[in-house]
Amino acid sequence: MTAPLPNRHTRTAIIDRTRVIIDYRTGSTTVLTGTALARWLDALEQSAAPAPVAVQASAISWGTSESAACLPLLPRPPWRWALAAGVLLLCTLGVRQFGSRGTRFGRLVRLAEAGRNLPPPPREQAALAVRSVRWVARFLPARVACLEESTAASLLLACRGRGGAWRHGIATDPIRLHAWICDIHARPVEEPDQTDDYTPLNTPAATAKRHR
């Protein structure tokens, strides 16, 4: 796959001697080495793209990890949270489905970052938002993965006057992507310990800093 030219929508992740390019408009991911990498770095020098992010090494897992054999029990959240989560999750799924398939990822990213300039949420509020979305998602006959779940939770927090909580990151061994919600201290909320393996690519510091 040919990588796009560096621009404000692209993120460059540094992993050893390679670079992983993620296009936040399309969700495409490209691994560059050798001559292709050299061309990318030359173009990056002249672009307004965010600076590359150094990815922390993940614990060696040989591409495997443990997970629960069944879904954990989730207590019902307060009704006003559950109702709001249901509406916003349906909105998220609608944005995902309606529109060009090639820009689906970009639409969800814009939705997830709608409240990025709001004050960050305390941990208890962020956790309630995530649990509310997960509780509602179990009743919907639709695919709700980390991107959809975290987007809906971010919207729910924005409705409560909190934002800047959505994170999207990359991990190694193997290279993989994940989206989650963080608290006021930038710690993952309602996430397994393995989420610490991911290096966020869209923190305010990472996206504000330009390569030049």
Please state what every model-predicted region is.
Residues 22, 149-212:
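Hydrophobic/aromatic-rich core segments of domains that either
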Residues 4-6, 50-52, 72-78, 119-122, ...:
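Proline-rich intrinsically disordered, low-complexity coils
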Residues 1-116, 135-142, 159:
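N-terminal accessory/pre-domain segments preceding catalytic cores
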Residues 107-137, 160-163, 167-184:
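Small beta-barrel nucleic-acid-binding modules, principally OB-folds
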